Amino acid sequence: MSSELSPIDKAKFVCAKRAAQLVESGMRVGLGTGSTAAWLVRCLGQRVRNEGLQITGVPTSTRTAELAREVGIDIITLDAAKRLDLTIDGADEFDGAFNLIKGGGGALLHEKVVAASSDRMVVIADVGKEVETLGAFPLPIEVIPFGLQTTHALVDETLVSMDVLGRDSSLRMDGDKPFVTDEGNHIIDLHLKRIGDARQLALTLNQVPGVVENGLFIDICDTVVLGFGDGKVEVRDINDGTIASERMIFAETDNLFSDLSD
């Protein structure tokens, strides 16, 4: 069955399957958004059905909520959950200090609030998401609709004084209309190429009037579960500095995940 999956899909699947093993009955779990997080939700759903795993999920988007319901995971709001034991989510990039760029799926605001409300954040990613320096992937920022062009101009002005290699920006579109987040906001993607000081950039962007949140996740991620195309998985923990490797086994029943796409 594994030959039916591309190497990148194998990597996404194995890291999601390994991360799903971190979840225990009784936990309140933040469920991320994106293609890798979708594999995670499916893996958890399989454990709910096959093992009787009893968890409560807090989804970070309407898309994730729909998928969680589909696979049999009970979901509640973050306000109802109050505090989460664990959040598992993907990342568009991560560096050696576990700083992240997230928001390629447009859910960065909910993702950051949910992650900040968790005792532990686990990032699942294929090996291609690991970088020496953040910035090759466009950095998304969520902005309110009011004064959109003004906010965009203020962001561009702010980038002039930032330690970045590129300063292009673009409004994210959905067909011929601006993309709309679950909160009714828009996304501006910053094409920075290289971010010299991610912490300073994150703080500065959030001071721009009209900017709600940015896709830099600093000092939030505790563990990275990294998947490889050959089935290898690495679990890296920043708190104790450990790296554990293993190889996940593909079973014939794993083809129930093959309908997921990027």
UniProtKB/Swiss-Prot annotation:
InterPro entries: NagB/RpiA_transferase-like (IPR037171), Ribose5P_isomerase_typA_subgr (IPR020672), Ribose5P_isomerase_type_A (IPR004788). It holds the Pfam family Rib_5-P_isom_A. The keyword Isomerase applies. Belongs to the ribose 5-phosphate isomerase family. Pathway: Carbohydrate degradation; pentose phosphate pathway; D-ribose 5-phosphate from D-ribulose 5-phosphate (non-oxidative stage): step 1/1. Keywords: Isomerase. This is Ribose-5-phosphate isomerase A. Its EC number is 5.3.1.6. The active site is at 111 (proton acceptor). It catalyses: aldehydo-D-ribose 5-phosphate = D-ribulose 5-phosphate. SUPFAM superfamilies: D-ribose-5-phosphate isomerase (RpiA), lid domain, NagB/RpiA/CoA transferase-like. Homodimer. One of its GO terms (cellular component) is cytosol. Substrate binds at residues 33-36, 89-92, 102-105, 129. It comes from the Bacteria. CDD domains: RPI_A. One of its GO terms (molecular function) is ribose-5-phosphate isomerase activity. Catalyzes the reversible conversion of ribose-5-phosphate to ribulose 5-phosphate. One of its GO terms (biological process) is pentose-phosphate shunt, non-oxidative branch.
